[in-house]
Amino acid sequence: MINLFRGLLVVLCFASAMVAAEEKNILVTSGSDRAAPIAVVPFGWQGGNVLPEDMAEIISNDLRNSGYYAPIPKQNMISLPTQASEVIFRDWKALGAQYVMVGNITPAGGRLQIQYALFNVATEQQVLTGNVSGTNDQLRDMAHYIADQSFEKLTGIKGAFSTRMLYVTAERFSENNTRYTLQRSDYDGARAVTLLQSREPILSPRFAPDGKRIAYVSFEQKRPRIFVQHIDTGRREQITNFEGLNGAPAWSPDGSKLAFVLSKDGNPEIYVINLASRQLSRVTNDSSIDTEPFFGKDGSTLYFTSDRGGKPQIYKTNINGGGAERVTFVGNYNANPKLSADEKTLVMIHRQDGFTNFKVAVQDLARGSVKILTDSNLDESPTVAPNGTMVIYATRQQGRGVLMLVSINGRVRLPLPTAQGEVREPSWSPYLN
């Protein structure tokens, strides 16, 4: 059964092109605009012990990861103010900074009080000020919060730095001894915790829209089944146990339904189940492989991957009935669709030519243009931040599966720190506050 499941995925993910793509759209390989220089000055600390986290570094990294801002390195800073009255704007103008943030951390009754301020260097005006308090263990949370507030103030886009990520690791100890672990971490890979361990594969973890539940595929008892697990309690509920393939779960926007792939009737097709009534509905009916469903925010539109045209491409359909409409036309392979929050951009795995050149790309759904975001060759499983500014994906580096982050504008691309072993199957959480 495992071999059958993997075989079907290989057929879909690595099928060679049979005919040339219809070139309706255009391909763009990079952008040329520039990130805004910003300085996040090391926060002042009034306590005696060394703090376990560097607030300024976390905030700088968050803003950098968005692709909107280019942090100025600490070693280049002319002065190190920790409060508003100490800011010398000519220092920051000399460095070309557009914005500067200062902050101060004070111990207060077993907690930490953090005050911060953000300035526009050109106008020398304060654009944001605030304070937040918490414990030592909450320093990363507070740093992500400040980054969220700053990003939203400057861009009008809600920050997504306080979100979480799911991923799966596989550690092979011998030929028949591999440990699979489902992990949850901060979006940047920090503070990973284990949600599930198994000697059998774990696939396709997905956060529910409420952020409190997850769905995934487990090969316990040597066959694929879909489970829903409550994060806080660990309580699990088996959702499917059909013969053949049970895979690729995807939540509806209201969390009341799951779409997934079943082959119980002989061919991999997409189904939707109502989690309350357990009513199962078949959505696709084609002789091809249909897989990787993803709901639009209306709860009725379903994007999916199919090779019904002879090669994997992305289609959309309505779960209540009707035909499928092809969405992608650039390249000989497009798969694993995800939508940005505003549904203007489709994120996918794209191959322009060849047999192993799989990259993360985005398609403007209004214009049809496609832009490649990555320069690696074996990318898979893209997942999009809830504000649409960043993508995390799995790829291979030096023979090992790793996770990477790329900004949607293509300016930033970097590896994420994760546990040992093969790392795969990332999934971004919704907003959690």
Swiss-Prot record:
Keywords assigned: Cell cycle, Cell division, Periplasm, Signal
Function statement: Part of the Tol-Pal system, which plays a role in outer membrane invagination during cell division and is important for maintaining outer membrane integrity.
InterPro entries hit by this protein: 6-blade_b-propeller_TolB-like, PD40, Tol-Pal_TolB, TolB_N
NCBIfam families xref list: propeller_TolB
Subunit record text: The Tol-Pal system is composed of five core proteins: the inner membrane proteins TolA, TolQ and TolR, the periplasmic protein TolB and the outer membrane protein Pal. They form a network linking the inner and outer membranes and the peptidoglycan layer.
Cross-referenced SUPFAM superfamilies: TolB, N-terminal domain, Tricorn protease N-terminal domain
Signal peptide segment: 1-21
Species for this entry: Pseudomonas syringae pv. tomato (strain ATCC BAA-871 / DC3000)
Subcellular location: Periplasm
Lineage: Bacteria, Pseudomonadati, Pseudomonadota, Gammaproteobacteria, Pseudomonadales
BP-aspect Gene Ontology terms: cell division; protein import
Gene designation: tolB
Superkingdom of the organism of origin: Bacteria
Protein name in UniProt: Tol-Pal system protein TolB
Family designation: Belongs to the TolB family.
Pfam families: PD40 (PF07676), TolB_N (PF04052)
UniProt feature coiled coil, ranges: none
A GO cellular component annotation in the UniProt record: periplasmic space
